[in-house]
Amino acid sequence: METFVASGLRLEDTELARFLTAHGYPCLDALHACAAAQPERFWREVEQALGLRWATPYQRVCDLARGPAWPRWFAGGELDLHDNLVGRIACEDPQRPALLWEGDDGSVRVHDYAALDDEVRRLATGLAGLGVRSGDRVAMYLPMVPEAAVVLLACARLGAIGLPLFSGYGADAVASRLQDSGAKLLVCADGYLRRGRQVDMLGEARRAAERAPALEAMVVVARLGGGRWPEHGAAHWRETAYRDLVERSAPRQGAAPHAADAPLMILYTSGTTGRPKGVVHTHAGFPLKAAQDMMMAFDVKPRDRIGWITDMGWMMGPWLVFGGLLRGATLMLFEGTPDHPRPDRLWQLAGRHRLTHLGLSPTLARLLMAEGEAGLPAPGALDALRVFGSTGEPWNEAPWRWLFERVGEGRRPIINYSGGTEIGGGILACFAGLPQKPCGFAGPIPGMVADVVDGAGQRLRTPAAGESDGGNGADAGVGELVLRAPWPGMAAGFWQDEARYVDAYWSRFPGLWVHGDWARIDADGHWFIEGRSDDTLKIAGKRVGPAEYESALVGHPLVKEAVAIGVPDPVKGETAVCFVTLAARGAAAATAEGWAASERALRAHVAERLGKPLAPARVHCTAALPRTRNGKILRRLVRAAYLGQALGDLTSLEDPAALDAIRACAEPAGAVA
């Protein structure tokens, strides 16, 4: 596979190169070796490079008395996160922009570091006045508005545990998380704008609050009301306007140190069954991991401007806040959708705010690519942009090349980034200034002692240079992605459920974190994620990732998007069934009469690329694919809907009607949605 090096960024000019030079490492491989062999030295150097200020120095970098599943990082140390993230820059460079916000309607707000410092201190005072104490859980049900960042930071200052929730959740999802966490207070918005329409949040929040007996207060951000929210008595909680609370509270000065391993935040991530998992992160670990990844992989420097299309209820929202502010950067928060009111809205946003870093999903790139010329930026719109970021799902080659070549003009690297909520950041990444392959990763982020193992937990052999990797065969290095050592950003367990955490990640192979992804390493040392290990198909004994099918289909001119699942087959054991949405030129093929010929053509197209034994049994045409609001296609739900199985947790689903289209495909006689 062809290797690319973005022309606009040299390795020697990056923060990674500066770190290597400052600490005497001749190359990145030497840094990886040190991180594996001397983790205490490595992580001490990282925290010092990030400039962490300790109120009480730590006694030990990592205490493993309870084993690798339960490390205590920076044991004995205390730090004031507010001082590290906001306070020191508010003193040294008060007018540096900290938060930029653009609403769906184009309205803009700016907080410099001094204003952010003042508002965080005021809100912390106000929350304390409402009874919030260290260790209490404070939930936030907010769109991407500046107040979302302020709430996270105010909780950190108080030692309260922040609980960011996805803004698209309904009352049931919010209630289950309030109940599980025992949240004392909820900060919510009255609503937000999406594609020019008002979306209610306060009604959903109140319905959820009725089922959360531990909740004592609700603070309401008037995003839509445009004025002050009147205090409102309710069944067992009281309501207060956010703006009133901030304005009547003093910006209390002084330090606010907390233990390095004190809980900072609970991030909920959905499981396929059972209740959502509350992933606990700590005061030192999560900000350090986020900022380290920004420094080493993304080349984020102080005063850079970072935007990421995400939600505060997903890991990348808090990652942006804690990592970006620790790097002294300016954060861009965007309320709207990146293709409204025009397909080039995202590029306009990046240009208007002079973003240096922009994060987006592969799905968004595919959608914009399908718009043709209308999905491209205007000349000069991205002049300030140095780096693209991407996470959340695997790439297909065609949209990757479109983003790199057509949008990025070959000058801007795409930092592919794979990790997860439980990781607190990334396991694998590309690195600014280093070669990259479409859809792949240059390797593990330093400190992540990653490996690929077989079903017995044994390391898989990587093909030698010049040796064929055999495509994607089981003996060519495709196996489970594991981690052989702990790291500061790792989950400090699941909220009040230690056994479930150990079972999820540490129970399969002794001493190894099993992440649940299939991965492979090619002969050049580049890494590739082949999908979730529970998504992988095994057809007549041949293991193949769904991304293989999806990449082949998206490469056909009829297809806009694709998803592949495995279904039971009496002969092969399992066979592939695919679902596609159509590009503009394929719309005429969507009729029942025209689709039969198009389906045959697409099956042949896949067979030509993957081999006849791996040809999909069916390729269905559907109007939409089930996805989250941040663009991730939900294969689990596609498979469950198609097979008529229980759907499980639907809280992250954007459009439930998409599941009806999938169910229709399963009807007799090959009905087409």
Task: List PLM regions with ranges.
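AMP-binding/adenylate-forming catalytic domain of the ANL superfamily
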Residues: 217-222, 608-633, 645-672
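AMP-binding/adenylate-forming catalytic core of the ANL superfamily
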Residues: 140, 165-191, 205, 351, ...
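Gly/Ser/Thr-rich phosphate-binding loop
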Residues: 306, 326-329, 355-360, 369-438, ...
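Structural core segment of the AMP-binding/adenylate-forming
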Residues: 153, 157-244, 361-362
